[in-house]
Amino acid sequence: MHIAIAGNIGSGKTTLTEMLAKHYGWEPKYEAVDYNPYLEDYYKDIPRWSFNMEVFFLKERFKDLLQLTRCSKQQTIVQDRTIYEGVYVFTKNNYKMGNMTERDFHTYMELFDSMTHILHYPDLMIYLKSGVSHLVKNIQSRARDYEQQMP
């Protein structure tokens, strides 16, 4: 079984993933936040690097989902970020805010649409909703360098 936790940055996805994995003995799958070669550049010049960064995240999340699809047949896996948030929240927001050209956005969406033919949706998706002040407090308290530069 594949259980996905969705929510904004700082909403508690990783914390809930840890709690569920520990309580039920499920296998946790965390978003790899340690390395993205575009992240630092992105926060310095968002319009220039948004497409590159979003494609990098899409590639990583797609690889994770392929692995999850194979593993979730034998065990329950709980995941703390989904490919769908990257597409329908972050990338779409970058486009709407003028940080991504229409051409780049359509190229990105065509790539994602091609991937969806072999993806399986999670068996259950849990959405965490939080107020902005709570999100900001959580982001600041964990002190990830790249998040401190967020506009």
Residue ranges with predicted function:
Residues 16-17:
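Post-Walker A alpha-helix
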Residues 5:
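Hydrophobic anchor at the beta1->P-loop junction of P-loop NTPases
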Residues 1-2:
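Pre-Walker A (Motif I) flank of P-loop NTPase domains
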Residues 22-60:
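Conserved substrate/cofactor phosphate-moiety recognition/catalytic segment
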Residues 60-103:
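A basic- and aromatic-enriched beta-loop-alpha substructure that forms the phosphate/nucleotide-
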Residues 8:
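P-loop (Walker A) phosphate-binding loop of NTP-binding proteins
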Residues 13:
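Conserved lysine of the Walker
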Residues 88-151:
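A glycine- and Lys/Arg-enriched "phosphate-lid" helix/loop adjacent to the NTP-binding pocket
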